[in-house]
Design a protein with these regions (language model features):
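Peripheral interaction segments used for macromolecular assembly
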Residues: 1-208
């Protein structure tokens, strides 16, 4: 399932231990080597405590759904210096959004304004590209598959050729996360099925 990365910003983080939201995402940290999200920087809530780490590694996400990312507790949050790979990428100050997109012949295609992420692997799947002004009247936005990317640097993304450009469809914008783990806010009943726990019921009532 694909989801727009922009939909993962200001996304709730829910704790099993607390039974509700404890903080939110501030930005995604993308590794330019393999174009995957490795962590989310967090802001607000419990991470305002200086003793609580302010980054969530994607491997510590138990589940993700419409309500937010579910984690065991704030104990999984880390500081940048605690994880060598994370610290290294943060020092690169890499930001996929805003990069120019050009072909091998240096023809300008546009700039990255968003990207879609595979909800199972957190790998960047497609770039959402805003076209230059004169071309935007025909194709305001395009999506480019990661397989067409040949090079990335601090300023631009180079793609194989512009023959591979595809118009962004409305269905791409509307795709949402769906859980791919058993919801820890549910518990099995005696029939071996799942039923909502009181925590889940309370969360649903609050959202209403």
């Amino acid at each position: 399932m694909l989801v727009l990365a922009s939909n993962l910003i200001d996304f709730p983080i829910l704790s099993i231990h607390v039974g509700g939201e404890i903080t939110r995402t501030a930005r995604a940290i993308v590794d330019p080597e393999d174009l995957s999200i490795i962590a989310f920087e967090l802001v607000g809530g419990i991470v305002s405590d200086p003793e609580i780490g302010n980054f969530l590694m994607v491997e510590d996400i138990r589940e993700y759904g419409d309500d937010g990312f579910i984690v065991d507790s704030a104990d999984v949050f880390v500081e940048a210096q605690d994880v060598i790979r994370l610290n290294k990428i943060l020092k690169l100050n890499f930001n996929l959004r805003g990069l120019k997109v050009v072909t091998k012949t240096k023809k300008k295609i546009g700039k990255v304004v968003d990207y879609t992420v595979d909800s199972n692997t957190f790998s960047v799947y497609q770039l959402v590209v805003q076209r230059p002004l004169m071309q935007s009247f025909v194709d305001p936005q395009l999506t480019i598959n990661r397989s067409q990317i040949t090079e990335i640097d601090d300023y631009s993304v180079t793609i194989d050729h512009d023959k591979e450009e595809i118009k962004l469809t409305d269905s791409s914008k509307d795709e949402e996360f769906v859980p791919n783990f058993v919801n820890p806010f549910r518990k099995p009943n005696y029939a071996g099925q799942e039923e909502e726990s009181s925590v889940s019921d309370n969360s649903s009532k609050t959202s209403e």
